[in-house]
A protein has these predicted regions:
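Intrinsically disordered, low-complexity segments enriched in small/polar residues
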Residues: 11, 107-109, 170
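Conserved non-cysteine loop/helix-boundary elements of the Radical SAM core domain that shape
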Residues: 1-104, 113-130
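Glycine-rich phosphate-binding active-site loops on the catalytic face of alpha/beta enzymes
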Residues: 107-112, 178
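Residue-identity detector for glycine
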Residues: 3, 51, 82-85, 107, ...
């Protein structure tokens, strides 16, 4: 791994998080304390209909364990809102989950049917307007979480990987281990 400064783990399904992986992340200095967990939802029924192999409680346990074992870990996730049959109650369960878990980074996609997938023909497709409202609600909540997280970083000294100089400015562009290129902006 000579010449490589940082290794970042992206798109790691929650069920793939083992004690061994946690130890490697914790002990290998080149592996960023950053993990992208595509959880998609937090309601057990929706997770099952999506074909996911974890439950809400397992997700809570994984996030809790990661934060306990690696206190400075940056956790990122992606969610899908408006999956066929998603009720307002199931959506609110997802909102509460996001509020409780306080992910450092979070993206929300609205469900869109893909040809030849089981979900494309499921009953109770959600109206586009409802999907967009749900997405906006989750992103507004995440903005609050992101603001709180950023406030906690004030005064911290962090290693920054410089990516380039800003043209015609006496400044540079860089990122910390908490910022994945092309994912976190």
């Amino acid at each position: 791994m000579s010449g490589i400064q940082w290794i970042r783990i992206l798109y790691c399904y929650p069920e793939e998080i083992t004690d061994e992986l946690i130890q490697v992340i914790k002990e290998e200095p080149k592996i960023c304390h950053y993990l992208d967990l595509p959880i998609q939802h937090a309601n057990d029924e929706i997770l099952k209909r999506m074909g996911r192999r974890t439950s809400k409680q397992e997700l809570v346990d994984i996030v809790t364990k990661l934060r306990k074992e690696i206190p400075d870990i940056c956790l990122r996730t992606t969610l899908i809102t408006g999956f066929p049959g998603e009720t307002e109650e199931q959506h609110q369960e997802l909102v509460e989950f996001v509020d409780e878990m306080e992910f450092d980074r979070l993206g929300v996609f609205t469900y869109s049917p893909e040809e030849d997938t089981p979900a494309a023909t499921m009953p109770d497709q959600i109206e586009e307007e409802v999907k967009l409202e749900r997405q906006a609600e989750l992103m507004e909540l995440q903005q609050e979480v992101a603001f709180d997280t950023a406030e906690k970083m004030i005064g911290r000294e962090m290693l920054v990987m410089i990516e380039g100089k800003i043209a015609d400015e006496p400044a540079y562009v860089g990122r910390t281990y908490r910022d994945a290129p092309k994912v976190d902006g």
